[in-house]
Regions:
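Catalytic-site neighborhood detector that most strongly recognizes the C-terminal catalytic loop/helix
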Residues: 72, 80, 136-138, 248-274
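Short, polar N-cap/turn motifs at the start of nucleic acid-interacting alpha helices
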Residues: 122-129, 239-261
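Active-site/catalytic core of tyrosine-dependent DNA strand-transfer enzymes
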Residues: 83-86, 161-218
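Basic, Lys/Arg- and aromatic-enriched nucleic-acid-binding interface segment
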Residues: 29-33, 37-41, 52-120, 126, ...
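C-terminal catalytic core of tyrosine-transesterase DNA break-rejoin enzymes
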Residues: 52, 103, 107-114, 204, ...
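Proline-centered turn/helix-capping motifs that create local helix->coil transitions or kinks
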Residues: 51-62, 125-128, 134, 140-141, ...
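C-terminal secondary-structure termini that scaffold catalytic or DNA-interacting sites
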Residues: 127, 138-155, 159-164, 170, ...
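N-terminal core-binding DNA-recognition domain of tyrosine site-specific recombinases/integrases
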Residues: 1-55, 198-204, 219-225
Length: 285
């Protein structure tokens, strides 16, 4: 353990680089970039407090950066659902609030914090859009807080499908009914809410999602994987990659290219199969 005075920017940067290699106890996979960003933010807040108390003169976190994580593309293939698995999940939760929740994340390609931070004021039922401008996270000492999204590009307006908007309208009606019937209802105004009106604790929401996957007989793909699934399905359907990147809130279109490069391999094989089906009869005759 180093004394506070010996915590240099280079030491903190080395620590940040190292935690990219740490595996999450929930998924047994490397920590998501958002988790590393949160750790850096919390560490900066702690050391800022140390500055105020005159223990250190400078915050060593200032000047550090979050490196771009390198991912194995073979592993990347395993973190998304197939079209059939998406249908299986949505069929399993049909008629429950979870149908709206997971449709929202898939359709809007939302991060967990963005989805849980969405309020009814962010939903425009007339235009069929949502405004992503909040991030509901667990900060230092597990304190829940509403922050701004991870980057300027993450603040965005997203047009949703008619089906997702229909599900959100049902959830809005459910919210209002619960509010009228329950005098102890907490008017959090969250789109994704617990039955008592309170917003979900991110970890609790994740555990509920994981239990649902298990009950539905689906692989334990993370919520971030659900977001990736939404992006992947849009790209596979032929959507413009720039439009998909903007919709996902990626700060750089290269991020979209890097993560979903494996799609071009899938599409190439599909193209070969199509050509083979066309030419094979001619060759055999």
């Amino acid at each position: 353990i180093k004394p506070l005075q010996k915590l240099s920017t280079s030491v903190i940067q080395e620590f940040i680089n190292d935690i990219f290699l740490v595996k999450s106890p929930l998924s047994d996979k490397p920590l998501a970039r958002e988790s590393v960003v949160g750790i850096r933010r919390d560490l900066s807040a702690i050391l800022r407090k140390a500055m105020m108390l005159k223990y250190i003169s400078l915050n060593p976190v200032t000047g550090t950066r979050i490196p771009r994580a390198t991912k194995n593309l073979d592993e990347e293939k395993t973190v998304v659902f197939s079209k059939e698995q998406v249908q299986q999940l949505l069929s399993f939760v049909k008629g429950t609030p979870q149908e709206a929740w997971y449709s929202l994340i898939l359709d809007g390609t939302l991060r967990r914090g963005e989805a849980l931070g969405l309020t009814w004021q962010d939903v425009d039922f007339d235009k069929g859009t949502i405004k992503v401008r909040n991030n509901w996270v667990e900060g230092a000492n597990d304190v829940l807080e509403m922050t701004t999204p991870k980057s300027l590009s993450s603040i965005r307006t997203i047009k949703l499908t008619d089906n997702t908007m229909r599900l959100l309208r049902k959830e809005n009606i459910r919210y209002k009914e619960y509010k009228l019937k329950n005098p102890d209802f907490v008017d959090s105004q969250r789109v994704i809410f617990m039955n008592n009106g309170k917003p979900w604790i991110p970890k609790s929401f994740y555990r509920k999602y994981k239990r649902t996957l298990e009950e539905a007989g689906l692989p334990p793909i993370s919520l971030h994987g659900l977001r990736h699934t939404g992006i992947t399905l849009q790209l596979e359907a032929g959507a413009n990659i720039k439009a998909v990147s903007n919709r996902a809130g990626h700060s750089d279109i290269q991020i979209t290219f890097d993560i979903y490069t494996h799609l071009t391999k899938n599409m190439e094989q599909e193209t070969v199969d199509i050509i083979e089906n066309i030419l094979s009869p001619a060759v055999n005759n």
